[in-house]
UniProtKB/Swiss-Prot annotation:
One of its GO terms (cellular component) is mitochondrial inner membrane. It comes from Homo sapiens (Human). This is Small ribosomal subunit protein mS34. Signal peptide: none annotated. Residues 196-212 have a biased composition (Basic and acidic residues). Its main location: mitochondrion. Keywords: Disease variant, Mitochondrion, Primary mitochondrial disease, Ribonucleoprotein, Ribosomal protein. The keyword Chloroplast does not apply. GO terms for molecular function: structural constituent of ribosome. The gene is MRPS34.
Length: 218
């Protein structure tokens, strides 16, 4: 009976899967990658020193999993926010936790990943996603008795004004330019004042939309 030949493409695919599995097994755990030496303020795994501006927070504040590890069920359903958001924005910014996956190799279960529904500047996203910067030392847990007051928000009425007349000098210049080009239009020139919608600089990016973060997480 003839031996069945294995197609080269199947062998290549099997080799690719084996390499991917080895890379996954050799990948450093979160507890290794984001461990901090609090005396030298460096990350032992990479040898990089934390930014100077982060030193005070590293000594006083907590990482997200440090807070959640003290709670039943790792705080599922609770609200968490960041100190930087409290300083930067008057509108409520927080995550409502939907899933937590701690790194069980960490000594105090203070590393891992978390997912939640983001509310940023009063606007709530429709789907849960992975929370970024969980290793930063600036997370705050919203007390249960303060959640209702913390999430209360009345959005300001949007400005419906779309355009305004040009100043007299600019209006005269535009009309003169029209006449020079042979334009006989009698339409009044108007200046568009609609704002361009842009995400704030500290809006949490989706993990699938960005590459591997560069620099030293704090």
């Amino acid at each position: 009976m003839a031996r069945k030949k294995v197609r080269p493409r199947l062998i290549a695919e099997l080799a690719r899967r084996v390499r991917a599995l080895r890379e996954q097994l050799n990948r450093p755990r979160d507890s290794q990658l984001y461990a901090v030496d609090y005396e030298t303020l460096t990350r032992p795994f990479s040898g990089r020193r934390l930014p100077v501006r982060a030193w005070a927070d590293v000594r006083r504040e907590s990482r997200l999993l440090q807070l959640l590890g003290r709670l039943p069920l790792f705080g599922l359903g609770r609200l968490v926010t960041r100190k930087s958001w409290l300083w930067q924005h008057d509108e409520p910014c927080y995550w409502r936790l939907t899933r937590v996956r701690p790194d069980y190799t960490a000594q105090n279960l203070d590393h891992g990943k978390a997912w939640g529904i983001l509310t940023f500047k009063g606007k709530t996203e429709s789907e849960a996603r992975e929370i970024e910067h969980v290793m930063y030392h600036d997370w705050r847990l919203v007390p249960k008795h303060e959640e209702e007051a913390f999430t209360a928000f009345t959005p300001a009425p949007e400005d419906s004004l779309a355009s305004v007349p040009y100043p007299p000098l600019l209006r005269a210049m535009i009309i003169a330019e029209r006449q020079k080009n042979g334009d006989t239009s009698t339409e009044e020139p108007m200046l568009n004042v609609q704002r361009i919608r842009m995400e704030p600089w500290d809006y949490p990016a989706k993990q699938e939309d960005k590459g591997r973060a560069k620099g030293t997480p704090v």
